[in-house]
Structure formats: structure tokens, C-alpha cells
Amino acid sequence: MATTVTLKSFTGLRQSSTEQTNFVSHVPSSLSLPQRRTSLRVTAARATPKLSNRKLRVAVIGGGPAGGAAAETLAQGGIETILIERKMDNCKPCGGAIPLCMVGEFNLPLDIIDRRVTKMKMISPSNIAVDIGRTLKEHEYIGMVRREVLDAYLRERAEKSGATVINGLFLKMDHPENWDSPYTLHYTEYDGKTGATGTKKTMEVDAVIGADGANSRVAKSIDAGDYDYAIAFQERIRIPDEKMTYYEDLAEMYVGDDVSPDFYGWVFPKCDHVAVGTGTVTHKGDIKKFQLATRNRAKDKILGGKIIRVEAHPIPEHPRPRRLSKRVALVGDAAGYVTKCSGEGIYFAAKSGRMCAEAIVEGSQNGKKMIDEGDLRKYLEKWDKTYLPTYRVLDVLQKVFYRSNPAREAFVEMCNDEYVQKMTFDSYLYKRVAPGSPLEDIKLAVNTIGSLVRANALRREIEKLSV
């Protein structure tokens, strides 16, 4: 049923994620070309020659989950890897939720997970709270991490795998004149000796992975195009111990046009504090007003708290028009891989970084050959086939359920259904479409229609009162 697909896509994928643990080349040693004399075909005969006396050299710009995962995969696959990250202690206004499958797929140690959330409350505009974790099994949870901890761990792991990690700011790149000439990167390196100004340097590389976030300079350098973006605003609040006990394994999501006209507000638990935040695409200038409303909705539960950090950052709303150019590819937020409605981005960032790196490792035969755009395009094709439908469906979901407070009330009402919860959590936790029941799918469709009808009736009554 279309409704079920929409709900499954809210936090999940349309097919299972599989991981490759070994990097084995599948590129044949010789290429058989059609006997056609066209200038476009000639390049195939010279694409990806063997590299003499050196390994393929790849720069990863940005050291978040996408960059860290990409750098580790490249280094393990025999690629000479350089990772450039501007802020080694970067904190980001990110809820920090990761699905259970990410812990296993990326072999994350449990000590970097601050909280294991097993209970979630979805709170409607009229403050009706629905518990949406009732179907979780005993071993299942949503991991809560701090980005500065997760990012540092992934960078450290990449370095241990053989990547060179540079504390630096990427400035620009000079594109090669020839198809196999190097890219020249211009960057400022900070070594603790030159102060805040740093030292300007250059570097030549064979390929570039842009993992430098929503304001990606790598994206600008390949004319990747613009996209809609949300402003996320978050305050980290240290609350009294007795208040923190309430949030020990609980996260809250608030919907309503007071907290955001097109997103939601959240209270997510961290190690010794809570993260309270919201976001919006359409009313960025009002973000502080929405943040205040989010705090007010949760005020009784965070009473006595002290704000210890304030964070704001742009978050992309859909993939960029262009994510690849020759030997440059975008991943993570730089590519626009954040889902609407849920705002999930950490898993998709790390996954895209790994997938892009795997394509380079395979195409280069573990660093022995030059790569071309065709090798990187395999990453995009695989990504789009697996994940792009999720982004498209979530666009529709946001338009249907986030368009008005009555529609949000209907959405929260629908979330009270245990079948909806089971399908949603199975999809989110494991990034797969869980097998459903045809009978339950029919019931769900009927209930969804009923919720929307009631929402529209409520909207009409509100409009009458406002006349």
C-alpha cells in the first residue's frame, strides 16, 4: 500500500543495506571497446592506466562521519589517503541519533554512545503525547552520540588504518588540464605553532571526496548547484539530576507551528545534559522564536537547567543537482544526504562516504590504477537505487503531515498505532523494509484516511473560528 511505503520510508530505506568487508577488484585487466571512431569513445581506451611506482592518491575534505568513514575505507583499500578537517573538536546542532544497524556495520564501540533510547514521545500541537517505542525488543535501542566524540573516533580510526589527518582549512582546487593530471588543492594548515593564521600550502591528488558539509567548498568548485536547506538551532542544557533521570532512556519530539512550520522540535538525552533544538527551512529568521517555543513546551521537565552550549548550522533538505564531476565526488551533507521530516543524516553520511570510497578502491584495483568518472558513477548509481526513493517519499510525507496543526495532530494520532510503530522502528533501526501484513496494511490505510479526514474537519472548524 502506498501509505505503508510512506510510513516505512519515514525513517528507513526501501531495501536492505549490505556491507562489504573485503576490497576485491572486479575491474577486468583489459577493456574491450566497440570499433567506432568517435572522439567520445577514444577516452575509454586510455582511461585508468596502471600507476607506476606509486599508489592512487585521494584527498578527503571534511572529517565528519562521511569523511571519516571514507578515509578509513580508502586507507584500508590500499589508497594513499589524506583527510583535511578544519575543526577537530567540531560540535554541531545535531540530535545525535544513530540507528542500531550503524553500531554493527561501522563496528562502533559502545562507550561512545551516551544514551540508549528505548522510549520516545511524539507530542502534538495540543500537547497530546504518544509513546512510540512500545514495540522495541529488549535488545533494541536508538543510540545517542555527541558529534564531537563520534567524529573524532572515526578520524582516529582512519588514521590508524593509514590515512594522514591534517588539521587544515580547504580553500580551493585547481582542476587538471588533462584527463589524468592531478588536482591541486590549496589549503591552510594549522599546526599549533603558527597561531590562528596557519600556513598556506598546496597538494596534488588524483581524486577528491567532498565531505565538507552543507556549505561545501568542494561542491562550489564543481558547480554542484544549490539546494534548499534548513537552519538547525540547538542548545545543550545541563538539568538537575532528578530531571535527568526522566530523560535517561527517553527522547521527545514536538510538532506544531509554534516550534517549527515545517520541521519539529526535540529534546534528546546526552551523557550529562539534554540537547534541545529545532529547525526550519521556510522561516529561518524566526529560528530563535521557534527555539524558545520548544523550550517552553518542555519547560517543566528541564526546569532549573543551565545552557552550556549554543549551536546553529545549515542542514540540506535534498540531494544536490550535481554530486559528481570527473574525479571529484560529494558525500554526506555536502551531497545533500539528510532526510526530510526525520532530519536523519549521520548514518547516511557515513554510508555514502564508505560507498564512495569502495567505488574508488574497486575502480583503482586497490590503488594500482587511475580512476575516472565512470568509477565514481558506480557509487552514485548504487546510492540512488538504494536510497533516493526514500528522499522522494519523505518530500510527500512532509507536505501531507507538516502543512498545518490539524495535519500534525493526525500524524501523532497515527503514530499511536502499534503496527505503524513496528514498521517504522524496524525500518529505522535496520535500514530495511520489514515484511508487513496485508490485512494490517489495509487497516493502516483506512486509519490514515480517517486521521486525515478528521484533521481536515478540524482545520475547517478552526478557519470558521478565525473569520
From Swiss-Prot:
The lineage of its organism: Eukaryota, Viridiplantae, Streptophyta, Embryophyta, Tracheophyta. Part of the FLU-containing chloroplast membrane complex composed of FLU, CRD1, PORB, PORC, CHLP and HEMA1. Its EC number is 1.3.1.83. SUPFAM superfamilies: FAD/NAD(P)-binding domain. One of its GO terms (molecular function) is geranylgeranyl diphosphate reductase activity. Residues 1-43 form a transit peptide. Catalyzes the reduction of geranylgeranyl diphosphate to phytyl diphosphate, providing phytol for both tocopherol and chlorophyll synthesis. It comes from Arabidopsis thaliana (Mouse-ear cress). InterPro entries: BchP_ChlP_pln/prok, FAD-bd, FAD/NAD-bd_sf, Geranylgeranyl_Rdtase_fam, Geranylgeranyl_Rdtase_pln/cyn, Geranylgeranyl_reductase. Coiled coil: none annotated. Its main location: plastid. Keywords: Chlorophyll biosynthesis, Chloroplast, Membrane, NADP, Oxidoreductase, Photosynthesis, Plastid, Transit peptide. Belongs to the geranylgeranyl reductase family. ChlP subfamily. Gene3D superfamilies: FAD/NAD(P)-binding domain. It catalyses: phytyl diphosphate + 3 NADP(+) = geranylgeranyl diphosphate + 3 NADPH + 3 H(+). GO terms for biological process: chlorophyll biosynthetic process; photosynthesis; vitamin E biosynthetic process. GO terms for cellular component: chloroplast; chloroplast envelope; chloroplast membrane; chloroplast thylakoid; chloroplast thylakoid membrane; mitochondrion. Pathway: Porphyrin-containing compound metabolism; chlorophyll biosynthesis; Cofactor biosynthesis; tocopherol biosynthesis. This is Geranylgeranyl diphosphate reductase, chloroplastic. It is found in: Plastid, Chloroplast membrane.
